[in-house]
């Protein structure tokens, strides 16, 4: 057992942690501390408030936590007025948008918890020094924040991209007064406008989330120099960091800002998402005034955009994600999973050619994304909520009668079972159940046995008693990239705690990939049996998966943990191949 020393030294940390986390008194007092990661749908098929109301039940079947939507008002003359072109000098009235508010209030949401009203930087034809024009732009932001607040939306989705050329709100080169004012003068004015905008936003909606397709991530190349303005002056979004700085001047701590990092459209590795998150959290602070950097660190979230078309487009397209030897839709799953792991809260999914739900847009094809790219919804479902995905897949397999666990003697009913290499192993009196081994720390004097009369249904269970720190173990041959659902039942009597841990070994049996260990704790239940359930993915260097049924904190013979119905299932074969 010498080769296990480092591994079990690490386990001791988990044993102590497990005892704290599963103590009943703490469970009774602690709120749900998990950070829920969310997928937000946007793209050419985004709904307006009326279509959302009409199609909500169908839309909430898709794997999203919210949508970007358009609010359209009606003027006194009966003309439509969208909130999106907010950077204009047109005068708006908030009552024009009351119908949109009413339609959103009428929606009975069951899944879409985080919806965002779309707002854009177009037409962008108002000079930053135009006080009268900016009075209207600021009022547009106020109205948009009012619509979001009154309708129960999470906040606003701001798209800074210019679509009304030659105008470009954040480009110094596009400003009408560039011959009269230097870049620094324009930047100072943009910061002032940012303060004005944020002030009215929080007056209407003090707890708003301002979700941007991108913030300073678009200007990251300007960092690393004493004066970023020298580089920003030549960039298409060079004035945008100044406006963001203005937001930060007056933003209260109740507001969340999201850098959506649209540049992630072509990311195709976990490392790219992690490095981008570090840039947003790290060097992008250099584009913020020193006095605002604490606010930036506390209130700006990292997010990422997933461009669905890049997983469908032909290879010659500049917007193309390679399958790296496998189905491209599998890369969608892998990359969305990586994006959610690196993001603070949100990942947004953007599509153009196809649709998730009905849309009148003529430039969106009639086929759904599921039809155009089979397996894409399954990929997003898994990335968003692996446990929910596993429960559904296992339930379907169980109903079909083809659910077979890979665990040997997982129900603890057998006198003999095979080892990982197929050798017969018979149970020995006083030892762990057949097919299982056990380990405990050198100062632990407990017992690991087979209780033939215990268990969920009384057919047998693994029993650990008076164990200070230890575990039952069983290992399996696996391959990198495979995904598994693992579950067990446990019952704790007296002092102590229990959990299920998945560890990794090389094909030669050496422990590896320790940061990718996974530990699963059960929730208390009425019948004293709690379920331990989790989903894992085999890391590159691993050839074996090890299930550890961990126990700690026992001191007396009456301190007992029983484990039963340990199961391991491989989740789905690789997703179907996508078009071209």
Label the predicted regions.
Residues 1-10:
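N-terminal secretory signal peptides that target proteins for export/translocation
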Residues 12-23:
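Bacterial N-terminal signal peptides
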Residues 25-27:
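Sec/Tat signal peptide C-region and signal peptidase I cleavage site
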Residues 29-400:
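Glycan-processing catalytic domains of CAZymes
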Residues 397-580:
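Extracellular and organelle-lumenal recognition/adhesion modules and their flexible linkers in secreted
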């Amino acid at each position: 057992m010498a080769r296990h020393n480092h591994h079990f030294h690490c386990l001791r940390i988990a044993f102590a942690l497990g005892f704290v986390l599963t103590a009943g008194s703490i469970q009774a007092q602690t709120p749900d501390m998990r950070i829920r990661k969310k997928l937000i749908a946007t793209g050419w098929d985004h709904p307006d408030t009326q279509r959302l109301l009409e199609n909500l039940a169908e839309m909430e079947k898709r794997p999203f936590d919210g949508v970007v939507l358009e609010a359209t008002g009606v003027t006194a003359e009966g003309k439509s007025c969208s909130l999106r072109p907010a950077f204009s000098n047109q005068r708006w009235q908030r009552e024009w948008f009351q119908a949109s508010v009413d339609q959103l209030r009428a929606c009975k949401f069951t899944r879409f918890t985080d919806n965002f009203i779309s707002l854009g930087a177009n037409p962008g034809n108002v000079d930053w020094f135009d006080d009268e024009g900016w009075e209207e732009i600021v009022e547009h932001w106020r109205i948009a924040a009012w619509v979001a607040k009154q309708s129960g939306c999470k906040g606003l989705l701001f798209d800074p991209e210019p679509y009304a050329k030659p105008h470009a709100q954040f480009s110094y080169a596009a400003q009408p007064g560039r011959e009269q004012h230097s870049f620094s003068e324009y930047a100072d004015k943009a910061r002032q406008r940012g303060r004005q905008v944020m002030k009215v936003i929080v007056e209407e909606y003090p707890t708003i989330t301002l979700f941007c397709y991108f913030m300073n991530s678009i200007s990251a190349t300007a960092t690393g120099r004493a004066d970023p303005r020298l580089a920003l002056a030549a960039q298409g979004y060079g004035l945008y960091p100044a406006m963001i700085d203005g937001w930060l001047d007056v933003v209260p701590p109740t507001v969340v800002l999201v850098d959506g990092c649209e540049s992630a459209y072509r990311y195709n590795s976990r490392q790219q998402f992690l490095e981008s998150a570090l840039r947003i959290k790290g060097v992008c602070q250099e584009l913020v005034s020193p006095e605002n950097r604490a606010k930036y660190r506390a209130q700006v979230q990292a997010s990422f955009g997933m461009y669905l078309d890049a997983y469908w487009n032909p290879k010659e397209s500049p917007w193309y994600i390679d399958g790296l030897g496998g189905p491209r839709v599998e890369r969608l799953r892998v990359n969305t999973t990586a994006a959610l792991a690196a993001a603070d809260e949100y990942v947004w999914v953007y599509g153009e050619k196809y649709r998730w739900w009905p849309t009148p847009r003529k430039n969106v094809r009639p086929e759904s994304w599921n039809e155009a790219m089979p397996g894409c919804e399954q990929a997003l479902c898994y990335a968003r909520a692996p446990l929910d995905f596993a429960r559904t897949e296992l339930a379907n397999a169980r109903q079909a009668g083809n659910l077979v666990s890979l665990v040997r003697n997982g129900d603890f009913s057998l006198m003999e079972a095979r080892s990982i290499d197929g050798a017969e192993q018979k149970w020995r009196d006083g030892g762990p159940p057949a097919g299982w081994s056990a380990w405990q720390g050198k100062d632990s004097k407990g017992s690991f046995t087979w209780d033939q009369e215990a268990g969920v249904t009384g057919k047998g269970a693994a029993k650990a008693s008076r164990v200070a720190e230890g575990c039952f173990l069983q290992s399996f041959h696996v391959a990198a990239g495979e995904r598994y659902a693992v579950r067990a039942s446990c019952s704790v009597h007296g002092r102590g705690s229990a959990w299920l841990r998945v560890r990794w070994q090389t094909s030669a049996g050496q422990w590896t990939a320790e940061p990718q260990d996974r530990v699963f704790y059960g929730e208390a239940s009425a019948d004293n049996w709690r379920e331990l359930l989790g989903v894992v993915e085999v890391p590159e260097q691993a050839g074996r998966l090890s299930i550890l049924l961990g126990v700690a904190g026992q001191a007396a013979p009456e301190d007992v943990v029983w484990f039963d119905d340990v199961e391991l299932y491989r989740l789905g074969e690789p997703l179907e191949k996508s078009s071209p």
